[in-house]
Amino acid sequence: MRILFIAFLLLCSTLSHIAADAKSMQEIWMNMPQHFTPYLNQDLRSKLLLKPDSVSHNSINNLLGGTTTLDSLTTHYMHIQLSKAATLSLLLLPTADSDSIICMVQTYKGDQPESTVSFFTQEWQEIDNQQLWEGKSLQDMQHELLVKPKEMSEARFKQLVAIFNPMLIEVTLSPNDNTATLSPHPMFVTEEDKKDFHAIFLQRKFKWDGKMFKKVIINHFTNKSLGSTK
C-alpha cells in the first residue's frame, strides 16, 4: 500500500510539472518574437486579446494605421487578420514524446495567396521543417498538387506545368482535426489557360500524426479567385 501511495504521489508530481510547463495560447502569442508582427507592440498584442465574450472577434488599430483583427482564439488555435493583405494562424500540435509544438502559417494575399509554414517549440525555438510533410519539405509537395486528367494530352499537361512554375501554395489550418489543407495557385494565368488549370489542380489535406503531416484526402480544386471558367 505504501508503494502504491508513493507511486501515486510521483504521478501527481509529474502531471503537475507537465501542466506547469504547458503554455496557453495567450502566453504563446505574447511571447512570440516581435519580428513576426512588427506593427503590433506588446501593448497592442495584449489589447487584441481583450475580446468580450459577446463578440466573435476583436479589432484594433495597428502601428501602421491599419486594422488588425483577432478572428478566432481557443486553447490551441489562433487566427489573426494582421492587415488587408496578411493573416497569421497558430496551432498547437501534440507530439508523442514532448510538449506540443507550434505550427505557424503566414499567408500573404497579393494577386494570389501564398503561405509560409514554420514550426517552433513553445519557447519559440525554430524546428527544422524539411521533413514534416510526409518526410518532405512543403516546396517538395508542389508536384503532388497537379494531376493530368485522362482526356488531356501529355504534351498539353507538360505545357501547363511549365507555365505553372513557380507555383504558389496556400495553407489553411483546421483546429478541429489538426489538419492542413494545401491549395495551389498560379502566379499568372491567361483566360485561355484558365479552364485547363482548373482541371489539373488538386487540393490536398494532411493530418498531423504526432510527428509529421500525412496525406489523408485528395480533392479536385476549384479556385474561385481565378474567376469563372465558363
Positions of PLM-derived features:
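Short aromatic loop motif centered on NTY/YTY
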Residues: 130-209, 214-216, 220-230
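Short, surface-exposed coil-to-beta transition loops
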Residues: 85-88, 102-103, 112-117, 164-168, ...
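Bacterial Sec-dependent signal peptides at the C-terminal "C-region" and cleavage site
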Residues: 11-23
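Sec-dependent N-terminal signal peptides
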Residues: 3-13
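Mid-length scaffold segments of soluble, non-membrane domains
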Residues: 101-136
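Short beta-strand elements that form the blades of beta-propeller/WD-repeat-like
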Residues: 100-108, 178-185
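Short consensus segments that form the blades of beta-propeller domains
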Residues: 80, 107-113, 192-197
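Terminal domain-start segments
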Residues: 20-94
